[in-house]
Amino acid sequence: MSFNRCQTLVAAGLALCMSYVPMNVSAEGAIALPVPPLLESRSGQPLFLTLQKIHWSFDGKYSADIWGINGSSPGPTVRVKNGDDLKLIYSNRLPEAVSMTISGLQIPGTQIGGAARLISPNADWSPVIPIRQNAATLWYHANTQGKMGEQVHNGLLGMWIIEDDVTKNLRLPKHYGVDDFPIIIQDKRLDNFGVPEYKASEDGFLGDILLVNGVQDPYVEVSRGWVRLRLLNASNSRHYVMKISDGRPFSMIASDQGLLTVPVNVQALPLAPGERREVLIDMAKTQELTITAGESATFMDRVKGLFEPSNSLISTNVLTIKATGLMSLVTDGLPTQLAEDKTQVTSSIMQREIHLNDGFGINNAVLDTNRVDMTSRQGNWERWVITTNVPQAFHIEGVRFKVLNRNGQPTPPEDYGWKDTVWVDGRTELLVQMMQPSYNHFPFLFYSQNLEKADLGSAGQLVVSPQE
C-alpha cells in the first residue's frame, strides 16, 4: 500500500497526536501552582513595581525572555486596606514607553494612569493613591494606547486586593497562598521552544494553551475545608465558562467590585476578559477535583493544528485541587450574610446608547484623545444600554454598575453585585453610578475589553465633574 505526500503528512500528524495525548495525561498536575509574591505597604512605605525583561518557563521545559513585574509574570499581588494612602512607584526598565492602570480601583482620573501618564524607558511614575472603597479583587495592567493587547500578553499584569473590616470579621478563607489563592488565567500561543507568539487581529488574540499564574495545568495542595479562589480572566479576548469536575456548583461570594450580599451557587460560571469573581470550594470531604474552562480541542482539532494555527485550547484544565492533611482553619458553613448594600439612587437617571461596532470603534467612532465623548457629574446615576453584534467584554473606569438585564431577560446570579466589567452578547442594560471625578486632561476610558479591538479604537473618553 502506497501513500501520497498528503496522506503521509496526515498519518504523521495522527501518530504525533496519539503520542502527545498520553504525555499530557502523565504530566497532568505535575507543576505546582505558582503563587505570585505578596506586596504590602507597611508603616507608610512606598510599593515599588519594576517593569522589566525576565526569564520565564511556561511549560517547565523551556525558558523564554518575556516581560514581567518585579521578576515575575504575572507580577506580585498588591494588597492594601480601605483607608490607606499608598505611594506607588512604577519604574519602567523596558525598551518602550508603557502606561499602567488599576482596573476596578475607584480613584480620580489624575491618578488612574493611561495615556496622560505614559512612562518613558528608564523613567518612573509615583502616584499617591487613596484607597477608599470596600474589599474587592482588582487587577493592574498595561493600558498603553495602541499597545495594550501586546503589552498585557507580554506579561505586564498582576492582581490587586483591597481588604476592609467587613472581610476581616467574616469567617472566610483569608490566608494568602494557603487557603486564599489568586487564579490568573491567560491563553497564549508558544513556538517549539516555549517562546510566546503574538499576532494582533481585529477579532482579538486567541491562543491554544491555557496558563494559570504563568504555567500550564497546575495543581495545588490544600488543607481539608473551604478554599477561596480569586478568579481573574486576564486573557486578551477569550471568554471562559468555568466548571468543577465533580459537578458541584461554585459558591460565588464576590464580583468585580466586591462582596455580594449573600453567596450564590453557580453551576457553570462565565468569566469574561477583565472580569473577577471570588468563589469558595469545600474540600472537607473531597480528595481531589479539577476546575475546567470550557471544551478542549478534539482529536481532529489537534491534527488540523499541525498544519495551520488553531484557536482551540489543547487543554482547558485550569487547576487541580488536592486535599491533604488536617482540617483547615475555616471549616464552618458559608456565612449567610456577606455585605450590606443600602445604596439608593439619588439623582434622575439619563440614558445612553453605546454600540460596539462589528470591527472596531464605538458608536461609529474610534478613540481620539483630543475628543471628550461623554460628560457627567460625580454621584450621578445613568442607564447605559450596550449593544453589539460581536460578543465582547466592556469595561468602564471610575464607575461601578449593576447589570439590569441581558437581552430583556432577568440578571443571572453570576452577574449579581457591583461590577465594572461585563460580557455583552446582544443587548445589555446597566445601572451606572459615577463614583470618581475625571478631567479633560485626565479622562476616564470606557472600552472594549477585547484588547485588540481597544487598541484599534474601540474606546471613548468620559469626563466626570467633581461633586459640588
Describe the role of every protein-language-model region.
Residues 146-149, 155, 286-322, 447-462:
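Terminal connector regions
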Residues 88, 127, 279, 291-293, ...:
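A generic structural signal for residues embedded in beta-strands
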Residues 402-468:
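C-terminal soluble interaction/assembly domains
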Residues 212-216, 261-265, 365-371, 415-418:
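Active-site-adjacent structural elements in folded domains
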Residues 11-20:
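Bacterial N-terminal signal peptides
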Residues 351-362, 367-403, 420-441:
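C-terminal substrate/ligand-recognition segments
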Residues 2-10:
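Bacterial N-terminal signal peptides that target proteins for export
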Residues 26-272, 279, 285, 320-337, ...:
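Histidine-centered copper-binding motifs that mark active-site loops
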